[in-house]
Each structure stands twice: as C-alpha cells, then as structure tokens.
C-alpha cells in the first residue's frame, strides 16, 4: 500500500457481477483487474477492460509509470452522481462510461469509454501518488491528466481527429467561459463553493497549458521533467508551481513568464500580418498579441476607459506558435532565419512580447503561411487569408489540423 489523501478512500457494497482479467507490468508483476457492474450488464464490460489494459501499457511506455498495487478495481453503477472518480485502487464510474456493446454504442461512445477509463487510471500517478496541496491547485492533477488522456486517445486512434475533437470542445465551451462573467484563471483566486473549481478552464484550458510546455520542451524534455516531478514529489501534496519548476530544472529552461497562464484569465488574441519583400527575398510575419478585460483583471493590447481599470494588469503571454510555409502549389518550403537553415519544414516560434517580427529568408516568391499548426496555443488567431489560400491549405497542407481548419 501507499499513502493516499483521505478523499481517495472508497468502499462499495452491493449486488454486483464481476469481470476479471490480469495484466503483467513491465517489471513482471501480475495485477488482478476487476470490473464490477449491476446484474445484467456484464457482457458490455469487455471494451472497458481492454481500455484499462491499454491504459496501463501506455502509461508504462510513454511515461514510465507502472501500477503500484496487485489489484485494480472499477465499480460501475447507474446512479453514481458524477461521471467517474479515481479512488485509489477502486475507481467508481457511472455505468454510461463503462458499458458499451456494438448493438447500442456508437464510435463516439466507444472512444468516450476508452478515454475516461484511461483518465481515471492515469490519476493513480497524477493525482493520487502526487496530489494537490489545496483545491486552488486542482489543474495540477486535472489539467495534466486531461493532457495525458488526450495523448493516449491520440495514440490509440487518429491523432488529427482527436486534436480536432479537443479543440472543438475548447472553442465551443471553454472560450465562452473565458469571455463571460465567470471567467477565471487556470489556477483560480477564489471560490464560493467547491463546484466552482470543476470548470472547463481548470480541466481543458489546463490541459492546453500542459500541452504548450510539452511543445516548448519537446517530448524528451517533457518526459525528463515529468520524471523529476515524480522523483521529487511522490507521496506529497504540491502546487502547480512545483510542477512547472520540475520541468524548468530538468531542462534548464526558463518558464517564469509562462507562469502567467496560471494567473491570467481570458483567451489571448493573435493578429498576424505577412509581408513579402521581393528585393530582399524575405517574408516577415508581424505578430501582435492582446488579451481582453476579464472580471478583476485589466487586459493588454487595447484601449481602456480609466474607470474600467483594475488593480490586476495583465502582461504578455509566453506561447508557442507552430508554423510552416507553403509554395503556390502547396509544397512545404525550407525555412531559414537569421542566416541559419532550420532542420525540417516546420518551426515553433516563441512569442513573449506584445509585438514581434519574424523574418524568413531566401524565398523567391511570396509563401503562404500555415499558422498555429496542431493548434499549438489556446488563442484566437486572425490572419487575412484569401479564399484561394485557404483552399490550398485545405487540400495540400501537411498539418492535418490546419487542413481541417481551413476547410
């Protein structure tokens, strides 16, 4: 057994049926797996069991996290008052997130079961072994675990389709929350009752904050940071700051400015202009970032009436902007900046100021920029594409998300 926060204790009693299986960990230990359901539902649990075993194998391979007990159980009942809960060794689910059969379940149902089973299992390390110091730090476990379950679903299915689905949810539900009277930072400053913490900003935008750090550090760098985080804080109740510090220290990468994502609310806006110089054969991207006023926080990059100003003054975000350049046929162009060729035909530009310029060299014709590839930051992007340029991106861009976005 391992120490756990008191909120993770669970005990279930009832008339239940059980599906059993076994999983062998990377170190050779055998773990007994049990899924308990109400009578008559047993035949619809096989997909959930497969998803659980896939989750356990994936977490070992991707993050080096092995399950720590000899028994893992799931209980699914029809009247559980939430979707699912990661109680240590005994996850509790609403039946709709466990049961699936070809006769009644859609592809979306199957994907949802797979994703939520993974999410609750992944909490064993990001939430249980390392938990939150207080509920203001909720995104420490939820934003991180949403990122992990998104990556799992992307690896199990279509990465592009998963990203499109995640961004659709963000834009349709979290962006309005960011723009409304209930707007709050990923790490909230205050609350009236505990449900105020369980928001799309804490979960979904929190996952985007984790994803941006993954983009800035790269897969290997992010894994190094995660390993250090677990090494330092296993068995502890910690903060978002502790997580960011582990990523910083493992990679010698300064994330001081990036921390503003945890304290500043609202959806940033990027306004981008592209200018081609035929004589110099250069293409310049001018990027301006701004963020609107939100409750209790004054925005930047815009004019304000004096009476609307608050004590909290937002500042420029640090964010990754993935881009590529296409020729008139839609072929990717080699990238060269400041006299240096860039390895590959995609570059991650790091934005840190309200206004910046990036100059690409040795271009014989005006390129078409493919901007914010894979939706590399949770922002509103504005660029003056023509219909012809959008059609070209939609049909020829190598970035599948941007092909969908341009359509």
Positions of the model-derived regions?
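Intrinsically disordered, low-complexity acidic/polar segments
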Residues: 7-9, 42-44, 83, 102, ...
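Non-catalytic architectural context of zinc metalloproteases
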Residues: 1-50, 372-382
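Short non-domain terminal segments
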Residues: 7, 21, 91, 145, ...
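Non-catalytic accessory/interaction domains
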Residues: 1-3, 33, 39, 122, ...
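Hydrophobic alpha-helical and helix-loop surface patches within well-folded domains
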Residues: 26-275, 279, 285, 302-304
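Intrinsically disordered regions, especially transient/low-confidence alpha-helical propensity segments
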Residues: 4-6, 20, 55, 122, ...
């Amino acid at each position: 057994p391992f120490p756990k926060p008191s909120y993770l204790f669970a005990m279930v009693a009832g008339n239940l049926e059980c599906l059993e299986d076994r999983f062998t960990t990377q170190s050779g230990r055998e773990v007994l797996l049990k899924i308990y359901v109400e009578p008559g539902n047993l035949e619809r649990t096989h997909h959930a069991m497969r998803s659980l075993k896939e989750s356990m194998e994936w977490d070992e391979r991707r993050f080096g996290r092995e399950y720590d007990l000899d028994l893992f159980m799931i209980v699914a009942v029809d009247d559980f008052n939430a979707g699912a809960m990661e109680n240590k060794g005994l996850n509790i689910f609403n039946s709709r997130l466990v049961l699936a059969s070809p006769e009644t379940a859609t592809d979306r149902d199957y994907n949802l079961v797979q994703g939520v089973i993974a999410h609750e299992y992944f909490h064993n390390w990001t939430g249980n072994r390392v938990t939150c110091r207080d509920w203001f730090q909720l995104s420490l476990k939820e934003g991180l675990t949403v990122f992990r379950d998104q990556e799992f679903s992307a690896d199990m299915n279509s990465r592009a389709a998963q990203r499109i689905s995640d961004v659709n949810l963000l834009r349709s539900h979290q962006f309005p929350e960011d723009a409304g009277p209930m707007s709050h930072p990923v790490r909230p400053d205050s609350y009236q009752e505990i449900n105020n913490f369980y928001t799309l900003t804490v979960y979904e935008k929190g996952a985007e904050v984790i994803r941006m750090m993954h983009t800035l550090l790269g897969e290997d760098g992010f894994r190094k940071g995660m390993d250090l985080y677990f090494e330092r804080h296993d068995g502890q109740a910690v903060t978002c700051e502790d997580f960011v510090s582990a990523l910083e220290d493992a990679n010698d990468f300064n994330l001081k400015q990036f921390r503003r994502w945890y304290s500043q609310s609202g959806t940033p806006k990027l306004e981008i202009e592209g200018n081609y110089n035929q004589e110099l054969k250069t293409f310049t991207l001018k990027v301006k970032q701004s963020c609107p006023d939100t409750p209790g926080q004054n925005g930047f990059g815009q004019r304000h009436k004096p009476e609307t100003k608050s004590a909290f003054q937002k500042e420029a975000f640090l964010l990754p902007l993935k881009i590529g350049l296409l020729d008139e046929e839609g072929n990717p162009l080699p990238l060269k900046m400041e006299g240096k060729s860039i390895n590959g035909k995609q570059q991650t530009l790091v934005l840190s100021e309200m206004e910046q310029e990036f100059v690409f060299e040795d271009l014989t014709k005006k390129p078409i920029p493919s901007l914010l590839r894979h939706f590399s930051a949770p922002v509103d992007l504005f660029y003056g594409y023509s219909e012809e340029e959008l059609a070209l991106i939609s049909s020829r861009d190598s970035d599948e998300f941007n092909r969908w976005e341009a359509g």
